[in-house]
């Protein structure tokens, strides 16, 4: 593949962030975008990450971003025809002390306030 001599946007790094930027620019109609990766897409740090997407975060905006990411990964395979390997899993947290139980109850309340699906 020949690399263009110039582009409106040049993204260096084909990890999850670089690919996301290229994807979202393409979704809003940008055509003059080049993504540079020295090896294969997502073969660096992204490849070695656990790939867990817990929805509840410390702030509402970060929780919204995590929820959006999970929803996007669920639909990418259908949209692109490429397998993502994404599997939606839940999690279980156990409290061994009363203090930890109170902390989990506060987290559950925050999760509900942020629109995160939760079972107690």
Where would I find each of the regions flagged by the language model?
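Short, flexible hinge/linker loops that cap or flank conserved catalytic cores
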Residues: 1-4, 27, 86
């Amino acid at each position: 593949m020949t690399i263009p001599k110039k582009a409106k946007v040049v993204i260096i790094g084909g990890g999850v962030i670089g690919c996301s930027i290229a994807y979202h620019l393409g979704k809003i109609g940008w055509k003059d975008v080049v993504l540079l990766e020295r090896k294969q897409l997502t073969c660096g740090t992204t490849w070695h990450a656990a790939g867990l997407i817990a929805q509840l975060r410390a702030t509402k905006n970060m929780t919204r971003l995590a929820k959006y990411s999970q929803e996007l990964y669920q639909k990418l395979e259908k949209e692109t025809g490429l397998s993502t390997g994404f599997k939606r899993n839940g999690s279980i947290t156990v409290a061994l002390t009363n203090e930890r139980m109170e902390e989990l109850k506060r987290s559950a309340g925050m999760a509900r306030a942020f629109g995160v699906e939760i079972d107690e």
